[in-house]
Amino acid sequence: TNLNLASNKNRIVKLTNPLFIGGDSIRRVQPDGGGQTGSTLQIFKEGRPLGQFFTLKYAGKDANGVSQYYDKNNNLTTTPLNGVDYHYVGDAQPKLLLGWGNTFTYKKFDLSVFFRGVFGNKIFNATRADLSYVVTAGQTNISPYATDDKRTDARNNLFSSRYVEDGSYLRLKTVSLGYNVNSRLLNKVKIRSLRAY
């Protein structure tokens, strides 16, 4: 058995790019999508870790079924300001990385497996945000009736914590089954060893 565990911590000490002199942060990650002009998802800020999601904070629907968000003072609004009403909503960096490999043997057979995983990180689901946009519903092969948003909720897909999801996973990356052919059979044909996968 081989087991590797890692946990990394980082912190931005200083931003030195001349384009950002006088500021303490850089807004990054501008995914494309309908109605998303000027939206950013992450921030590089002095004193904070790399990979922080910094965007609108979703607060559900109001009584009329319209998406609402928290403004910078934590008051509810249906018309949030891009780049102003932003909050920290998660970390893209995993808290734990895992690699585990093992080989099992039985007589002439062996089975090797390798698992990889990350835990405690967030991801942004831009596909879900784009396909949920009620303004363009019906222009894709997804029925506008498949969404739980009203057609009048034109801000339902604003890049926000609504689409920040758990990014943890554990995956089987490789698996191989092998068989070592009996050496007595191989000696007859002058082969030292033969292994089948």
Q: What spans do the regions from the language model cover?
A:
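Conserved small-residue
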Residues: 1-92
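Membrane-embedded beta-strand positions in outer-membrane beta-barrel channels/transporters
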Residues: 2, 99-101, 174-178
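Transmembrane beta-strands of outer-membrane beta-barrel pores
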Residues: 5-11, 106-108, 115-121, 174, ...
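Core subunits and conserved enzymes of cellular information-processing
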Residues: 4, 97, 103, 185-190
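Extracytoplasmic gating/loop element in the C-terminal half of outer-membrane beta-barrel translocons
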Residues: 118-197
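Glycine-rich, aromatic-lined ligand/substrate-binding cores of catalytic
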Residues: 91-124
